[in-house]
Amino acid sequence: MRAQTLPAGSDHAPVLACGAWLKNAACLLRGAEVLWSPIHGDLGDPANCDALDQSVEQLLDSAHGQVQAVAHDLHPDFYSTQLAQRLAARLCVPAVAVQHHHAHIAALMAEYDLREPVIGLALDGVGLGTDGTAWGGELLWVSPSEWCRLGHLQSLPLPGGDVAAREPWRMAAAALHVLDRTGEIGRRYGAVVGEQAARTVAAMLERQLNCPRSSSAGRWFDAAAGALGVSVRQQAEAQAAIALEALAADYLSALSPPECVGTYVVDQDGVLDLRGLLEQLFALADEGQAGQAARGAALFHVALAEALVGWAADAAQGHGLKTVALGGGCFMNGILSASVQAGLAARGLQALLPRAVSCGDAGLALGQAWVAARQPTAALAPQTHLQEEGAPCA
C-alpha cells in the first residue's frame, strides 16, 4: 500500500473507490490522506481481479471504521463496478457510479484541493459516457459539486468495434469514410491487410454495420498513424501513438514545427472537428517522399495541441475561469502535454497536470472517491446505487 497526502485543509469522509478496468488500482480516501492499492493491471485477467479483491479488503481494514460510500466506474460490466456494488451491499452503504472522464478531472481537483470550477480536458482511449456511447475526447466544466460536458472531439466510427482500437488501419479507413473517400480504402490498404479485409471494412462503414462511434482522442492518434503508414496493427496498447510521438519528436528536434492552417473547426455544439487535419495527413502520405511520415506526425501533434488550446481557452473565457485541468492517458504524451500547457499559459490560463498520481486510469480511483465524498448526505442512503449525471451546461 502507498500513502498520498493531499494539500493541507483537505478533509474528506472515508470513501473506498474501486478504480477502472485498465491499469486498475483502488484507493481509500480519508481526511487528507489517500491510501493506494498496488496497480493490479487490466481486469480481463482473473488473477488481477483476485488481487483487487484482496486489496479492497486491506483498504477497508485500514479505514478503522465504516466507509461512507463505495465508488466505481459508470460501466455496469466492469469487474470493479460489480465488486463495488457487492461491497456496498455488504457494508450497507451506497455505491456511487462516477463517469470516467469526470473522474479524471476530479482526481486533479483532489490533488490540488481545488474549490472553484475548472475547465477539464480529458483525453484517453475510452470511457462510457452518460449517454451510453464511448467517450474519450472531452471538454468538461467541473466544480466540487457538479459537472457537465461542454463539447467533445468529432466522433469516428470504429469498424469492428474494439478490434479497431488494435488495428490503426481500420481507424484510417474510418477517417477516409468521414471524409467521403470510402472508395479509397481498398487502394490504400488492400495490399497491406488483404483485399478481402479492406473490402469488408469499407462495406461495414458504408452500411454502418458494427461501427459504433467514439469521441476517443486515442482513436484519432490511431487514425493519424494509419493514415501515415506508421502502424497497421498494434501488439500493445498505445503502440501506434507512441510510434507517432517518437517520429514527431525526431522531426521537431531538427526542424521548425509545420504550419497549421485549416486543420480544425469547432461547431456551435462545441464539437472539435479535425477532419481538415486528416485531409492534410493523407495528402502528405500521398507525396511518398522520405520523411513525410515524420512531418505528418509532427503536424498532427502541433495541430492537435493548437486546436485543444483554442477550444479550452474559449471555454474558459466563456465561463469566466482561469484554470484548465488536463487528465487522461493521452497526456502521457510529452509533446502534447508540454504544448498544451505552454499554449494555455500564453493565453493567461493555468494548466494543471497530475503530479503524484498517473494522468491515466491508474489514478482514476482518486477522482471516483473525491466525487463520491461530495455527494449530498441525504442522498447517501444505505444500499442505494447512485449514478451521477452531468448537468446540462448553460
Swiss-Prot record:
Gene Ontology BP annotations: protein maturation
Pfam families to which the protein is assigned, alphabetical:
HypF_C (PF17788), HypF_C_2 (PF22521)
GO molecular function, a single term: carboxyl- or carbamoyltransferase activity
As recorded in UniProt, coiled-coil segments are none
| Keyword presence, Transcription regulation | no
Signal sequence interval, chain numbering = none
Query: Which top-level group of life is the source organism from?
Result: Bacteria
Tell me the keywords, alphabetical order: Plasmid
The UniProt entry's sequence similarity note says: Belongs to the carbamoyltransferase HypF family.
Q: Protein name, please? A: Carbamoyltransferase HypF homolog
Q: Which organism is it from?
A: Cupriavidus necator (strain ATCC 17699 / DSM 428 / KCTC 22496 / NCIMB 10442 / H16 / Stanier 337)
